[in-house]
Amino acid sequence: MLQALLIFVLQIIYVPILTIRTILLVKNQTRSAAGVGLLEGAIYIVSLGIVFQDLSNWMNIVAYVIGFSAGLLLGGYIENKLAIGYITYQVSLLDRCNELVDELRHSGFGVTVFEGEGINSIRYRLDIVAKRSREKELLEIINEIAPKAFMSSYEIRSFKGGYLTKAMKKRALMKKKDHHAS
């Protein structure tokens, strides 16, 4: 029984680590992923080793399977809280909605406005880049000012140039100055 509990706990730890490592690889953060992978590998070997010691012990096998499933739930929760990376939203509007554009820019989001041809009239599209950790804030602003907007989103793997890059460089320089001042 103690072994089954240990296996369950190890799986609850192992699977979220596996989730984080996978996300880091997808985000092209290979060094961080390799570091996390060391811990992941050690936990994997220990827990699977306990299961393989006695394959007739069904409690250990059940603990492994249930722990894996619970670990997936926990891993997904942790991933959402970490919100690593950036996201782009494309927002389609019937009118230009300067109020929305101004509020988004004032809140620090990068916004580009496009004018396009719809079936019956001119349409406007906003491309908005944000850190995933600010996605909820972004959606609240859009839904408050333009609740009927059509939105689609996708994650950004990498980017170069533009407002966001300049803003990040500016913040990094300010942090450097603050660090040297202390």
From Swiss-Prot:
Keyword Ion transport attributed: no
Annotated TM spans: 6-26, 32-52, 58-78
UniProt topology in membrane: Multi-pass membrane protein
Location(s) in or outside the cell: Cell membrane
Stored Pfam families: DUF2179, DUF5698
Superkingdom of origin: Bacteria
UniProt-listed HAMAP family: UPF0316 (MF_01515)
Protein's recorded name: UPF0316 protein BCAH187_A3394
Organism: Bacillus cereus (strain AH187)
